[in-house]
Amino acid sequence: VDPAPPRDENDIFSLKSTLCDESARMFLRMRALFSLRNIGGKDAVDALAAAFESDSALLKHEIAYVMGQMQDSAAVPHLIDRLADGDEDVMVRHEAAEALGAIGDRTALATLEEFVDDDAVVVAESCEVALDLLEYVSSKRLNYAD
């Protein structure tokens, strides 16, 4: 169960506007977040990524989480940026790592390997889990294609 129900709206621009509005209640921002996840596709991913500029670590953590759920490779560069940013909250970095694993795009492999020894234990452990998950997800896709 999501922390907030998605809105009954498919206008990516409007949803992005709500998601990025720092003065909006978190519940409304979360509703926009889950609506964008449900819409899917590169435009929705880009709208979600725009909110990585938020001051809220909770929101950014949820953004990374839903990007992992979406399993869209368009999210990979955005998630790599969050993971690689040593100034980012560890909760966000941890979720970015796990989302990269869930997406299963091998372009994230080198970044996950780089941060498997991160000083933040939760980030390092998340990268370790993500590496195994990435291998699993990418091998399932390869086997499915055969």
Which role does the model predict for each range below?
Residues 55-74:
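Helix-adjacent hinge/juxtasegments
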Residues 23-25, 55-56, 87-89, 119-120:
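Short inter-helical turns and helix N-cap capping residues of alpha-solenoid HEAT/ARM repeat scaffolds
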Residues 5-20, 41-53, 72-85, 105-117, ...:
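Amphipathic alpha-helical scaffolding segments comprising HEAT/armadillo-like alpha-solenoid repeats
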Residues 69, 83-103:
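Short, solvent-exposed interaction modules
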Residues 91, 120-129, 142:
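Boundary/linker segments of alpha-helical solenoid repeat arrays
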Residues 2, 35-38, 66-69, 99-102, ...:
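Core register positions within helices of long alpha-helical scaffolds
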